[in-house]
């Protein structure tokens, strides 16, 4: 996987920005999952995390796992209070109307 930042990913895709406190964060992999306890133990530092989970607990998991960003799939959005927490914890959050699979396919092309 080539070196790419979250900012560069945004330039090469149609992903939307929800929060971007650390756009220079380097992406080193991709992880897909919605079961937070599972993601917490398996996502790697620097991963893009694709999920439909959009609550405060997902922000906490992204922080603990040190993911480069969260991509919310299928048009999922963040409530304003969750968005505020994401910004306070320096969690980049992007969104897409695509399914997790469609996002993963796009990322495999862009990140290779």
Each predicted region: which residue ranges?
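N-terminal first-folded block
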Residues: 3-47
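Feature captures the catalytic cores and cofactor-binding loops of soluble hydro-lyases/lyases
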Residues: 24-26, 36-48, 53-112
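Absolute protein N-terminus
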Residues: 1-4, 112
